Amino acid sequence: MTDATSNLDSHGRPLGVLRLSLTARCNLACPYCCPDSRDPEGMLDLQDQLRLIRVACSLGVHTVRLTGGEPLLSDRLEPLLAAIALDRPAGLKELALTTNGVLLSPERALRLKCAGLDRITISLDGADAASVARMAGLQGGTPAGQSLLDQVLVGLEAARSAGFNSSHGALKLNAVIQKGRNDDQLIPLARLARDRGLELRLIEYMDVGSRNGWSLAQVMPAMEMVQCVSSHWPLDPVGRSSNSTTSRWRYRDGAGYIGVISSISAPFCGDCNRIRVTADGQVFTCLFASQGVDLRPYLRTDESETQLRECLSELWTRRSDRFSEERSLQIDKEKSHAEMAYLGG
């Protein structure tokens, strides 16, 4: 077996996080994500997923985050959690989920908690009906936005009631902020999160994929977001932990924390420890990559898992990605990227 400590990429970064997409489909149509309406062919089955997680953990992965599309649309979610719980890899410290929360009923939240899920992050890009409708790509206008907002808030409370403790970081709120579209929602979202004891993470609008018409002019820099929030509720810096995507700030009045993810204005490529595997088994070593490597031949023909382990290990040790840093140097400006919903964020 490969020694997990020997798996450093060409920049000395260890492998630590596997983001595993369960589906490319989504029940929303957020314009910055542009999800697909159907899944790709050749989806990984349960045994493929389990083998992948087991081998990834043997190479140093300590956190598995289940993503989409919208993972709650996948009929693979609960069976996967149940199977992991039966034989959880020794190195797997955290099993997390990112969702829009629409399908997170009280019953389902409890099932997920009982099945061994450790953390849930819910995405919400507005705090009023019109903004929610606009950012989710809804056709029904304000009434549809209000219905969606109500569902997400129910999902948040369902997760809390199921035992996902926000004060311990087990329940967080994500928001993508796009200048000119929902930057007016910064303070309302911060207020919503503060009132509910949630840590809000504000994400810069990213140039992932080619469908969303990304422009640098639409990016609100993280520090500008921080200054905006701090003008209402003073903040003190906490910093960014090694390998984390989030720089955190503490509310001076004791109302918790807020975070920013600044992949455009202040890239954190230097200690990125993530790989992403799509629902059809393509592995990507960078969110901004244009092409992945198909793992299915290794997953389905090698019961010993040796070839899969060697493939992942070689892929990681040869890894040299630092796209966000290169973006600032105007390198590879015309390079195409895989789509956000396909990669799983």
UniProtKB/Swiss-Prot annotation:
Required cofactor names: [4Fe-4S] cluster
Amino-acid biosynthesis keyword on record: no
Pathway annotation: Cofactor biosynthesis; molybdopterin biosynthesis
Cofactor annotation comment: Binds 2 [4Fe-4S] clusters. Binds 1 [4Fe-4S] cluster coordinated with 3 cysteines and an exchangeable S-adenosyl-L-methionine and 1 [4Fe-4S] cluster coordinated with 3 cysteines and the GTP-derived substrate.
Keyword Nucleotide-binding: yes
Keywords: 4Fe-4S, GTP-binding, Iron, Iron-sulfur, Lyase, Metal-binding, Molybdenum cofactor biosynthesis, Nucleotide-binding, S-adenosyl-L-methionine
Family annotation (PROSITE patterns): RADICAL_SAM
Protein residues bound to S-adenosyl-L-methionine: 32, 69, 123, 206
EC top class named in words: lyase
Gene3D superfamilies (alphabetical): Aldolase class I
InterPro entries linked: Aldolase_TIM, MoaA, MoaA_twitch, MoCo_biosynth_MoaA/MoaC, rSAM
Catalytic activity: GTP + AH2 + S-adenosyl-L-methionine = (8S)-3',8-cyclo-7,8-dihydroguanosine 5'-triphosphate + 5'-deoxyadenosine + L-methionine + A + H(+)
The EC number(s) this enzyme carries: 4.1.99.22
Protein's GO biological process: Mo-molybdopterin cofactor biosynthetic process
Ranges of residues in domain Radical SAM core: 10-236
GO molecular-function term, one example from the UniProt record: GTP 3',8'-cyclase activity
Binding site for [4Fe-4S] cluster 1: 26, 30, 33
Function, as annotated: Catalyzes the cyclization of GTP to (8S)-3',8-cyclo-7,8-dihydroguanosine 5'-triphosphate.
Quaternary structure, from the entry: Monomer and homodimer.
Protein family: Belongs to the radical SAM superfamily. MoaA family.
Descriptive protein name: GTP 3',8-cyclase
UniProt source species: Synechococcus sp. (strain CC9902)
Origin organism lineage: Bacteria, Bacillati, Cyanobacteriota, Cyanophyceae, Synechococcales
